[in-house]
Curated annotation (Swiss-Prot):
GO terms for biological process: amino acid biosynthetic process; aromatic amino acid family biosynthetic process; chorismate biosynthetic process. Keywords: Amino-acid biosynthesis, Aromatic amino acid biosynthesis, FAD, Flavoprotein, FMN, Lyase, NADP. Its cofactor is FMNH2. InterPro entries: Chorismate_synth, Chorismate_synth_AroC_sf, Chorismate_synthase_CS. The gene is aroC. This is Chorismate synthase. It catalyses: 5-O-(1-carboxyvinyl)-3-phosphoshikimate = chorismate + phosphate. Homotetramer. Its EC number is 4.2.3.5. CDD domains: Chorismate_synthase.
Amino acid sequence: MRYLTAGESHGLSLTAIIEGIPAGLTLHPADIDHELQRRQGGYGRGARMSIETDRVQISSGVRHGKTTGAPITLTVINKDHQKWLDVMAVGDIEETLKLKRRVKHPRPGHADLVGGIKYHFNDLRDALERSSARETTMRVAVGAVAKRILAELGIDMLHHILIFGGITITIPSKLSFRELQERALHSELSIVNPKQEEEIKTYIDKIKKEGDTIGGIIETIVQGVPAGLGSYVQWDKKLDAKLAQAVLSINAFKGVEFGVGFDMGFQKGSQVMDEITWTPTQGYGRQTNHLGGFEGGMTTGQPLVVKGVMKPIPTLYKPLMSVDIDSHEPYKATVERSDPTALPAAGVIMENVVATVLAKEILETFSSTTMSELQKAFSDYRAYVKQF
């Protein structure tokens, strides 16, 4: 399985082409639209989300509600493009129109300046448009297809926010996977403690009035993954490493950890390692899950626990100082439409990116020309693991 995305933030559309999806997977536009709608939700989103109502168009690889095994083409139209016809025109236009929305004051923390240097852009909009988080629309769309595969194999997942702009979420003890999932899904903030909703919303409103932004830490949990996915035999076969790369590829993500993560640096080995158990009904298990479901780059059969940290959005309504790329004089950075926070949306993106990596690993590990073939191979493997 592999995919490519294309498109700009204010261009005509966003596109993804996915190759390697088994034939016979039940797939409807509504499956993808559901995930796209989740990405657009959450408290703190800005005006762009009131303009766009993302709906996918499937133009290849699916017939009569089933995948055919051919490449799948997904497209989402940018409604906002109608206001940017001259600025984002494909053909050449008058110089005065080119200057209309030219970006020459790069934003600290964004790809504007370095992108312009790398690709020799006189107008930093050429970097801004593609580096925008709008691109993650298609990564969510691809992830929605991946989640359909995982669902057919009995794998489920959730995300929730652990730290929201410096506020630590108090997680009630002994919540089951399903309880965590339901609480997060029904929260505008993707948190599992409803008692903290108003406190955080008030803080977001305050940050918005200040023209500032906030980030936080998101946790994704995956249930139902058997032991043995990934490999220790080469560095690039380690599944946790693949997940780390994928999570860090999400716009504004600056760190990733598994299980208790960086807290391991403060603990002893006897406190960190997960003791092994075995029962006739369940096979091998662990007393704890400090390592987040991974040993030696392979899954252990425990829930996968992946955490990612998102920096505050770099576009500020009270912009920081920058430099004019023409005169090299100090200037305030360009202001583009932005949000005080996009943490709930980032959680949806992270969840779908993780789903894509896991689906790819499964498709590469098991015979998967068709879904029935994959389901049998996966079921046989589960049975083997249980009786090892």
